[in-house]
């Protein structure tokens, strides 16, 4: 099945998700007219999957864009869109999950989400978001009770599917040991220079869809890397294929069986990022990409604390670094 030329994958929840979506996270972006206009343009050129989070402060802008798209006739029904948001760590407590989701729905002016994710496998001191995160306010997450609250949200119809983000194989195993509804998605960093083979294999075995964030390495962000866009191997492949480096990287992610999130507010790049489904990488291309040096860029360092549940980046990712 396709929507506007974008393949749709069926999640373990039985719900369809466009395999390519638009992300809305950016340094100091917050909600703005610029974000709303970019989302409207994305809908116009064919995007139907949008990813936000409470902590991004873009839920309001996305909600305004959806309302305008309906009003302007860009879409006929909200059901044409797939919208994801995320539970922030300060709300990762069993009695906070439902109110947090309801707050996101108010921000978005929607009756339901298509997907709600636990943003990180950690809890923070409840209350207002503070940046940087105080190192003495990082606590272990209670996987069982928080996930049970997520399951309740799905059973109430406030979200059609539930999942996680930034979970290692070990943390997924913890969660699934007591889950009644398995996570439909694990959203993680994934690109040619951080390929996540072990995690992808685990998720495939357990029918969890991997969604790749930063498929181009998040170049230009505070924490991102130019490693993907500057890769000599990817540049050589792009020249031979007559595609951009971005298209080669996105196509590689897609060919690994993952869904992916892209973020550009430039109309031409938005269109370019959609043009990855009618061609293929060669076996030689795939072999060369598989041999690229690997490096995690999104380390999760803000959640590492000598007094917290994760005393090192290695502990946070269970040595999947």
Swiss-Prot record:
Chain positions of site Lowers pKa of active site Tyr: 86
Active site, per annotation: 56 (proton donor)
- Gene3D superfamilies per UniProt: NADP-dependent oxidoreductase domain
Positions with a binding annotation for substrate: 119
Q: Where in the cell is it found?
A: Cytoplasm, Cytosol
Q: Which domain of life is it from?
A: Eukaryota
- Nucleus: is it a keyword of this entry? no
Q: Which UniProt keywords apply?
A: Cytoplasm, NADP, Oxidoreductase
Q: What pairs make up the disulfide bonds?
A: none
Family the entry assigns: Belongs to the aldo/keto reductase family.
Q: By what name is this protein known?
A: Non-functional NADPH-dependent codeinone reductase 2
Native organism is: Papaver somniferum
Q: What would be the name of the gene that encodes this protein?
A: COR2
């Amino acid at each position: 099945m396709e929507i506007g030329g974008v393949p749709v994958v069926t999640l373990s929840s039985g719900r369809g998700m466009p395999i390519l979506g638009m992300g809305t996270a950016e340094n100091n972006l917050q909600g703005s007219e610029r974000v709303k206009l970019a989302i409207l343009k994305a809908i116009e050129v064919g995007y139907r999957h949008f990813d936000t989070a409470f902590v991004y402060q873009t839920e309001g802008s996305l909600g305004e864009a959806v309302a305008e798209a309906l009003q302007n006739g860009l879409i006929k029904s909200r059901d044409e869109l797939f919208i994801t948001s995320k539970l922030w760590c300060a709300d990762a407590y069993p009695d906070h999950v439902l109110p947090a989701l309801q707050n996101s729905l108010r921000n978005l002016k929607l009756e339901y989400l298509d997907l709600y994710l636990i943003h990180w496998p950690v809890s923070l001191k409840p209350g207002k978001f503070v940046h940087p995160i105080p190192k003495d306010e990082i606590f272990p997450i209670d996987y069982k009770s928080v996930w049970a609250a997520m399951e309740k949200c799905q059973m109430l119809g406030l979200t059609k599917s539930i999942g996680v983000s930034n979970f290692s194989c070990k943390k997924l195993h913890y969660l699934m040991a007591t889950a009644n509804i398995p996570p439909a998605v694990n959203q993680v960093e994934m690109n040619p220079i951080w390929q996540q083979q072990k995690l992808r294999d685990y998720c495939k075995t357990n029918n969890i869809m991997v969604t790749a964030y930063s498929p181009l390495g998040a170049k230009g962000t505070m924490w991102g890397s130019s490693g993907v866009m500057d890769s000599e191997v990817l540049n050589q492949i792009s020249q031979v294929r007559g595609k951009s480096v971005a298209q080669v990287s996105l196509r590689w992610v897609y060919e690994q069986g993952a869904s992916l999130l892209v973020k550009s507010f430039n109309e031409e790049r938005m269109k370019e990022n959609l043009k990855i489904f009618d061609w293929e990488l060669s076996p030689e291309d795939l072999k060369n990409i598989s041999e690229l040096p690997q490096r995690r860029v999104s380390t999760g360092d803000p959640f590492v604390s000598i007094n917290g549940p994760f005393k090192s980046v290695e502990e946070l990712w269970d040595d999947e670094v």
